[in-house]
Every structure is written in structure tokens, then in C-alpha cells.
A protein has these predicted regions:
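S-adenosylmethionine/decaboxylated-SAM
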Residues: 6, 75-270
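Rossmann-like AdoMet
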Residues: 1-87
Length: 270
């Protein structure tokens, strides 16, 4: 997460969350191991079964319970549970299926704006159980590691197969730029500063190294800058990247929200 601005700041800045919310995540930290086991237990067929992922797998992992006017009420039984994924299952499911088909060759995963860490954990584990030769995972956020992140990193350190790196900083920090140049992450999920300039800077930060760049909130009434930026990037990056969009909506929600946009460097296309 880079410097947030405007109304999106209160949504994204976990430093503003009350202490009881941190305690909730501390209480839920044991679920991290359960989630890892659940992901690892999936069969290859289940990993590309979009209907199964949408209706069973993702709701069971637990969904976000903030800004519920943006959330489909039919998913209420999953709100405020587990990994607290701030995603629509009908967007995340086809994205995960796509990722399962494109995980080969990925050695490092970076998330800009990891916040509580649920999505970071899901994607990192999804990659390493879907054929990626994952050697390093990098989480970036200006807040200190949350209970989810701390628990996950402890597990990775115990296993000693994947190097976990946490950078507590804004993505505009020169130190972050130096680390990116050194670590050269080849798959990056951008969900930090939702201003036009901030999201574009994050894209440029990783473009030279990443074979896959994914942007969040590309089809959201609440995030006009990132929505517009995705449309522009889709055109500007067309000579080098193929674009894939996951923007399904729920009729029960008034408006369009969230949205995942993935870009894969054409030279890396399978």
C-alpha cells in the first residue's frame, strides 16, 4: 500500500483499525495453517473448476466484512471469517483458475498493499501448489506485519523452502525501489495507493522485472482512478502484455466494485 488519498484512505489504512480488530485477527491466526492445508488438498481438476472455487472453496476461506454495501448479501455467512478476503468469489474464482494455468516458471511473488494478509497468503500458497517454483515471497505495506502475516512467515521459516520478506514502507520509498531492483519479483499484485499517480508508479516500479502484473479494483465505482488506469494500461501495454480481466458483478449489489486485471508478458505466454 502506497500513500492512500481521499475516501479510499480510511478503507485501506489498517493503522486506523481499532485494537479489537487486531485482536480478532490474532484470534484467527491459527486459521492460517488450516487455510494452507485446504489449498494444498485441492486436486488439479478442482484448481480449474471455477464453479467449485466460487461456490465452495472461496466462501469457506472467509470474506471481508467492511463496506458491506459493496458486498452481495447472499454471501453474508462468510463475512468476517477466516482469511477475510476482500474479493468477489465470482471474480476471484476465474482468476485463480487462470493462475493455476499460468503458475509455471514463477519463482517470486510480491504484493504491494498486503494489509491483513489474507489475499497474500492465498495467492502465495496457490502458486506453490500449482506448479510454481516459488523461492521468495515479498509483502509490502506501511503497517507492521499483522497476525496473519506473522503466522504465515513463521510457518515459511520453519519449512525453510521459501524466503519470506516483509517491507514495512510505502512503495514510493527509495529503499523499496532498491529492493525491487535487487529481488526482481516476476509476479506482482498491485493493491496499494489507489490514486492514479500512485497506482501508475507501482506499475512502473515492477514493470522491468515482472512477467505477470496484476491490478486490483479495475472495475470499481469506488475506485475511479484505478479503473481508468487499467483501461489505459490495457492499451499502452498491448505490444508487450496480454491482458485478462475478471470483473463479474452480483445483481444484488447496487453498483460495480472490485475487479482483477492480469497482464502477462507476451514473451512469457504459454
Amino acid at each position: 500500500m502506497s500513500n492512500p488519498s481521499g475516501p479510499i484512505a480510511s478503507m485501506l489504512n489498517a493503522q486506523q483499525a481499532p485494537d479489537d480488530r487486531y485482536q480478532r485477527f490474532a484470534d484467527l491466526a491459527p486459521f492460517v495453517r488450516e487455510a494452507i492445508d485446504t489449498i494444498a488438498a485441492l486436486t488439479p481438476a478442482q484448481r480449474v473448476d471455477v464453479d467449485f472455487l466460487e461456490r465452495e472453496f472461496i466462501p469457506a476461506l472467509g470474506l471481508n466484512d467492511e463496506l458491506l454495501h459493496e458486498q452481495p448479501p447472499e454471501l453474508a455467512p462468510s463475512f468476517g471469517k477466516g482469511l477475510h478476503l476482500w474479493q468477489y468469489p465470482n471474480q476471484l474464482a476465474p482468476y485463480l483458475a487462470w493462475l493455476a494455468r499460468n503458475a509455471a516458471g514463477i519463482t517470486s511473488y510480491m504484493e504491494i498493499g498486503c494489509r491483513w494478509g489474507g489475499m497474500f497468503i492465498l495467492v502465495a500458497e496457490w502458486l506453490r501448489t500449482s506448479g510454481a517454483d516459488l523461492k521468495r515471497v515479498i509483502a509490502l505495506d506501511p503497517i507492521a506485519p499483522t497476525p496473519f502475516i506473522a503466522t504465515y512467515f513463521e510457518l515459511l521459516q520453519e519449512q525453510a523452502r521459501i524466503e519470506p520478506i516483509y517491507m514495512q514502507a510505502f512503495s514510493t520509498s527509495p529503499l523499496v525501489a532498491a529492493h525491487v531492483d535487487r529481488l526482481k519479483p516476476d509476479f506482482v499484485f498491485i493493491d496499494g495507493d489507489h490514486s492514479l499517480r500512485g497506482a501508475m508508479q507501482d506499475h512502473l516500479l515492477v514493470r522491468a522485472h515482472a512477467s505477470i502484473i496484476v491490478h486490483h479494483d479495475i472495475h470499481s465505482r469506488a475506485c475511479p482512478d484505478t479503473t481508468w488506469l487499467w483501461k489505459a494500461l490495457r492499451e499502452f501495454e498491448a505490444p508487450s502484455f496480454d491482458a485478462f480481466e475478471f470483473t463479474n458483478q452480483y445483481p444484488s449489489v447496487n453498483g460495480s466494485f472490485l475487479g482483477i486485471g492480469a497482464m502477462k508478458r507476451r514473451s512469457a505466454q504459454a
